Amino acid sequence: MSFTNATFSQVLDDLSARFILNLPAEEQSSVERLCFQIEQAHWFYEDFIRAQNDQLPSLGLRVFSAKLFAHCPLLWKWSKVHEEAFDDFLRYKTRIPVRGAIMLDMSMQQCVLVKGWKASSGWGFPKGKIDKDESDVDCAIREVYEETGFDCSSRINPNEFIDMTIRGQNVRLYIIPGISLDTRFESRTRKEISKIEWHNLMDLPTFKKNKPQTMKNKFYMVIPFLAPLKKWIKKRNIANNTTKEKNISVDVDADASSQLLSLLKSSTAPSDLATPQPSTFPQPPVESHSSFDIKQKILHLLNEGNEPKSPIQLPPVSNLPLNPPIQSSNSRLSHDNNSFDPFAYLGLDPKNPSASFPRVVSQNNMLTNKPVLNNHFQQSMYSNLLKDQNSVQHLFAASDMPSPMELPSPSTVYHQVFYPPTSTSVSSYGLGKTPQPAYGSSSPYVNGHQTQQISSLPPFQSQTQFLARNSDNSGQSYNSEGDSNSKRLLSMLSQQDTTPSSSTLSKEANVQLANLFLTPNSLETKKFSDNSQGEEISDNLHGESCNNPNANSVHSAQLLQALLHPSATETKEETPKKTSDSLSLLTLLKSGLPTPANDLQNKSQNNERKASSQVKELEVKNYSKSTDLLKKTLRIPRNDEPLEAANQFDLLKVSPQQKSEVPPKRNELSQSKLKNRKKKENSETNKNHVDMSPGFVKILKRSPLADQKKEDTQESDFKGSDDHFLSYLQSVVSSNSNGLH
């Protein structure tokens, strides 16, 4: 039928008869199935009828379906709701599964894409909706053939596909690799596919990172499948590489085995070798190789690297001389112990060197019956060896240095070791002590450093004591005139084992004088509440009674006899007898009566009271009971330091709160030294001597005025040590007598 002059109403009648009136009854009852038929009628109208009649209008599917619903009597019942029916059809159409294929080339770098008929259509893989009761693979084959004209039934793999759901519609595309680039594609449908082309996967959007997204809208139907396609290609390439390696190894082995079999089976040489051209020159005869020789060569080549190595055979040494000649010009080499034996050096038996080697039974040995070296060569070899040895020995013989043979054994060499003294070793120094040896008389002789005697005091304490002793000695300046009494007094103080001398002083007077002076309670319990008393005590030190340079030192000697020998005293106090000058001295000191020199003493007292400022308090501590401490306490300054001597014996009151604040200013004696002295003196003293321990006086100096200092120095220039000593004793006795009263 020709539609060249047909009207639009005639065209609708023809389309209704073709696609709707002849449908089965069950499809006519379903709006969805009727809509599919209306879509087929629309395609026929656009593809064929309008091609014959250009005057017919081009309509869309929605408008075309509305006109057909109104024109066909079977569709009148849905004419009023045809809009709703068409919307239901579109929703149903998007839920129909779609099947297609992705066709790749041999390198899997390009794929086949198709473009719709309209200009606004984009690129996509060939695919289509599945029909009723149609399988997925059959639908994919059919759609690929309709859109591209390529039959992929023999290449499709049902297990290789990409399945996705886009907007509620399931899409499955089967991957078909290995399509040739020379394949000709042509669509089998009318006005559905406009282009079919190969596209490089690297040029597609989202397939490669960091690539500008150009023309993305044209590939919107391809983009969702690119990521899974890239993963599939990667896995496929890895699998192909492994299979290729296996195939290559198998092919190589097969070729090698086939060549080997061909060589073994051939009875002659290979026939493919080029035969020589005939020439006029005479040719050498060519030896014919049998098949056995070829096989032997092949086996030899195959087993060339696996042959066991034959053991190395040593040359026979049975022909060597048993006793090689020894030529020695040195007398030292003639000795058995010093001679050089090459066989012993090599670990061989000198008498039978050949017996030292293991005997190996060898066959086909051509050298067993022949000598390895002739006798002349052996003679020269041994002579050269001995010449070298003799040259070394000759060097030792020519020099004065002994040879290694003449050196003594290490056991006879003695090394003398010197141990230098250490920096921490200090020799102790004590009064009246002699240094003791490091070892006793029974100790063996040791050739080395002997340990020096180390002081029992701590390093800092012994050093302090040593500095104090040096400072005391350096501060003393002795005068040559009128100093005999002072020297005598110091010599008597330094003696420890002084025997009592016969004197006119009675024992009772010595006892009372020693008790008055040495009793610590008299010094500790004395309270000086009045300042005038303290001034009076200090003034007594500068009295005129001490100004006589010609005073007799007998009193000092007798007094020291009583002080140094307290064991001769008695506990009972008796009234002193006035039998000698010392008794009168004791009575005078005890009574505190004025002496003929009281006038000068009163003058000095007045001057001292005018010049005295503030009196500092002292701390009196009892440290030890030894007489040596008393000697250190009673040290009287010389004529060059009168003011210091006067200030040292100012006994003042010390409050309990200030005892902790007053720091000691004199160098304290070490406790260990005092203990040693105490042990020696306890053996000599009496048991009653326990309470007779002197106190150690800690003194704070006071500074008089400058003008008064000059006057005191002028007055004390002619004072002797005995005068100072007697003045000090007088002040102590007077203070004790006042305290007792």
UniProtKB/Swiss-Prot annotation:
PROSITE patterns: NUDIX (PS51462), NUDIX_BOX (PS00893). Changing E192A: Abolishes the decapping activity in vitro. It is found in: Cytoplasm, P-body. Disulfide bonds: none annotated. Its EC number is 3.-.-.-. It holds the Pfam family DCP2. Residues 268-278, 439-453 have a biased composition (Polar residues). The keyword Metal-binding applies. Residues 1-243 are annotated as: Interaction with pdc1. Changing R18A: Abolishes interaction with dcp1. A motif (Nudix box) lies at residues 128-149. Its cofactor is Mn(2+). Catalytic component of the decapping complex necessary for the degradation of mRNAs, both in normal mRNA turnover and in nonsense-mediated mRNA decay. Removes the 7-methyl guanine cap structure from mRNA molecules, yielding a 5'-phosphorylated mRNA fragment and 7m-GDP. Decapping is the major pathway of mRNA degradation in yeast. It occurs through deadenylation, decapping and subsequent 5' to 3' exonucleolytic decay of the transcript body. This is mRNA decapping complex subunit 2. It comes from Schizosaccharomyces pombe (strain 972 / ATCC 24843). The lineage of its organism: Eukaryota, Fungi, Dikarya, Ascomycota, Taphrinomycotina.
